[in-house]
Regions:
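Beta-strand-rich solenoid/repeat architectures in extracellular/passenger domains
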Residues: 1, 10-26, 34-48, 56-73, ...
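Extracellular glycan-recognition regions
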Residues: 4
Length: 257
């Protein structure tokens, strides 16, 4: 492990010149503790997990340097951080194949900012945020892609503050492609302020996009093709979407229903 902090109450800070490359097991590991943790250096990972933060009940953990995680890397995992704040602002380049790329579950507040963040997988979910609040700065990715995951994107109970934005770069498909999911391609439940642009949803076994109890949903320049394999599956399936859903130049072709 490059850095391992377990039940640390004091402050831990490193400067921008720091670097961790392919540490055994986990590059940056934080378990418990309440002190502020700030890492401004880079992380390059091609084997274990790049970042793993768990069981924090308070305090902040901030990563302001670039993080690159490539297969067979195991991505970023944040779990059971009730009361803690976790922030990523230095740029994420995650390409983790069958492993989930970015996962936050079980509490706390998380933000991902910057214009160049990407997450690409095969059968791993690109982004999962479940029972965890997306903070005011939001969760921003330039592109999200998966091929054969259960879900490509999963948001569930992400709080009442902010949401996920996929920006693309202005050209078709530049926001990524969620394809061949065994379930719903993009699953949104009890989420808000979700904005998806230039994202393709193709060949997902259930709905291409399912939005249940979502407030403020914006879809822009999206193409949804051949989603669903049953009589109730849809290209887009909204259920109790609050605020005016805003679709702009969205094309839905050959849904199952």
């Amino acid at each position: 492990t490059g850095v391992s902090l377990t039940t640390v109450a004091g402050t831990f800070t490193t400067g921008a010149g720091s670097a961790i490359t392919n540490a055994a097991s986990t590059d940056f590991y934080v378990s418990g503790g309440s002190g502020a943790v700030t890492y401004a250096g880079t992380i390059v990972n091609t084997a274990g997990r790049s970042v793993w933060v768990l069981n924090r009940t308070s305090g902040s953990v901030t990563f302001s340097g670039a993080i690159t995680d490539t297969s067979p890397g195991q991505g970023i995992r944040l779990e059971n951080n009730t009361g803690a704040t976790l922030a990523f602002s230095g740029g994420l380049t995650l390409s983790t194949a069958s492993n989930p790329a970015f996962t936050a579950t079980g509490g706390g507040t998380v933000t991902v900012t910057g214009a160049s963040n990407t997450a690409t997988t095969t059968t791993g979910t690109a982004v999962t945020i479940s029972n965890t609040t997306i903070g005011a700065a939001g969760l921003t990715f330039r592109s999200l892609s998966s091929n054969g995951a259960v879900n490509g994107i999963l948001l569930n109970n992400t709080g009442a503050t902010a949401g996920l934005t996929v920006t693309g770069t202005g050209s078709a498909g530049s926001g990524g492609t969620i394809q061949n999911s065994t379930g719903i391609g993009v699953s949104l439940t009890s989420a808000r302020d979700v904005s998806l642009a230039y994202l393709n949803l193709t060949g997902n076994a259930d709905d291409g996009l399912n939005a249940a109890s979502v407030t403020n949903l914006t879809l822009n320049q999206m193409t949804l093709t051949n989603n669903g394999n049953g009589p109730t599956a849809e290209g887009i399936d909204p259920d109790n979407v609050r605020g005016a859903p805003t679709p702009t130049n969205v094309t839905v072709t050959a849904p199952a229903h």
